[in-house]
Amino acid sequence: GHYNKYNKIEMEIFRNGELIGYNYYFFERNGEETIITNQFKFSVDLLGTTIFQVESYGEEKYIKDQLISFNSKTLQNDKEKFVNLELNKKTRKYDIKGSSFNGEATTNNVIGNWWNHKILQAGSQISPISGSIKEQVVTFIGKEKIDLYGKIYDVDHFTLKSKDMNIPKDKRLDFDIWYDQKNLRILKVSYSRMGNWAVSYTHLTLPTSPHV
């Protein structure tokens, strides 16, 4: 898979230009099995009081390139959300038990995590927080250059939106995504919801580097 190159991807989360959290992906390999662990945490403060806080831990398991399980737990303020997904070997579909969805999903769905550029090729994604299935439309906007932490990248700019834009705004997909095609990785994601948010790639640890 395209993720065989990485040991760790680090991203930072900004709101209105202020750093408020992190989003890390860790990659472990054992033969044909790859386990990708995701940890993210952010909090929004207003006048010294935390008004919104999210902390999440998730684990995706692949055999070769096939997702076989995904489990996550998320604390949003004091509300617990979860996903337990398994590939059903008989039906060849995903069985999902989630905080906002219980049922089946086809294997064309991608877990909505930013390490995986296949999210740009999928017709629908599974929420990594609640397990809900969201149909999406990805549109190529154009080729651009972006500056991240003083480094210039050549990127393809896409929008990723819900197929049905009439669903409530807090459930809707509406992202701008900047993608480094040469290295098959998403470098930046932005969206607006209670402010302007951005998730930016900061650092990549490769298996060959000495400090792993």
Predicted regions and their residues:
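Single conserved hydrophobic/aromatic residue that forms the stacking wall/gate
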Residues: 203-212
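Acidic, serine/threonine-rich low-complexity disordered tracts
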Residues: 1-89, 118-204
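Beta-strand/loop-rich accessory regions of lumenal/periplasmic or secreted enzymes
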Residues: 106-122
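Short, flexible active-site-adjacent loop segments at beta-strand->alpha-helix junctions, enriched
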Residues: 91, 100, 208
